[in-house]
Amino acid sequence: MKFCRCVRPFLTAVALSLVAISIADSTSLSAADSETSSDDSSAISKPVLVEGRRIWDQAKHNAFTDLLRHKNRWYCVFREGSAHVSPDGALRVIVSDDGEKWESKALITSPKYDLRDAKLTVTPDGRLMLNGAGMIADAKIRYYSMVWFSSDDGQTWTEGKQIGDPGFWLWRSQWHKGMAYSMGYATYRDRTQRTLRLYRSKDGGTFDTLVDQLSAPAGCGEDTILFRKDQSALCLLRHETGDKMAQLGTALPPYTDWKWRDLNLRIGGPNMLQLPDGRILAATRLYAGGVRTSLSWLDPKNGKLIEVLKLPSGGDTSYAGLVLHEGLLWISYYSSHEGKTSIYLAKVRIPSQ
């Protein structure tokens, strides 16, 4: 098990050199680090951290990641700014051939918005698509969802275009059968007024409302949608009112009728994927017992998240990107457990059932 902590001074478009060192002294994956359900976790397959490395820390605050593998290259996108919320927020895209040496590909800025929470996908016609949001902290309508496209593998990007409805945050887009789906949550300051809307797009540039108001409890926030092999859909949803337990939504085609249920943990920044064997693994921020970024098995039938691996993390942390590649799960995330809020990359081995 190795954990690499190597960052050299930044040179634009010059690769970062990274050297592996042991994680054993700095990270303990003891049972005390794990928050599980009341089930006997001894029978649960537990992923193993193989390697981790810090890959970027050049801004004062580096956060909110996503990860993509495209044309045999790794793409990681995240926000750079002077603080967690600051008017100078910009979106940095870095690339790597091997996951060790990274170089800056693009920096997307705005004179008007604090740019936040970028997500990367590939459109059906092969373009890179970057979703994010522009924030004006003191405005009546604070958030505007936006999209950018690149036809040259991330070297240049189109001007940002607003999508969805003003004040609704389309947090992540998922492509399914040629259509992009995105949950958008209302960003009222009063969290009890925050509702959820489902959007759909043919091209990623124009999102139409598919369901105006879903029946998810008020106070909803960040989400991720998973389309399963049987064509059913799941939505893992952050919930920030009442007991603050995460929500799980389920739907069948055409995805207009969603059923919601409480899960057993409070979460933030959710992402998830389905393994080839059908199991579902989620990456989230967990709160009980200390804030951290962790992997959990999602049990949709019983409505449970079962934590199985705490990543080296703490403090200001979460917002993971997930890619399954050559038998390992690659995870980008951000954390401040080493002091400065920085971008990390972990590789995890997932045991078979």
Feature locations, PLM:
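N-terminal secretory signal peptides that target proteins for export/translocation
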Residues: 1-7
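General secretory precursor processing signal
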Residues: 7-9, 204
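Bacterial N-terminal signal peptides
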Residues: 11-25
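Beta-rich carbohydrate-recognition and catalytic domains
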Residues: 29-63, 68-115, 122-315, 324-329, ...
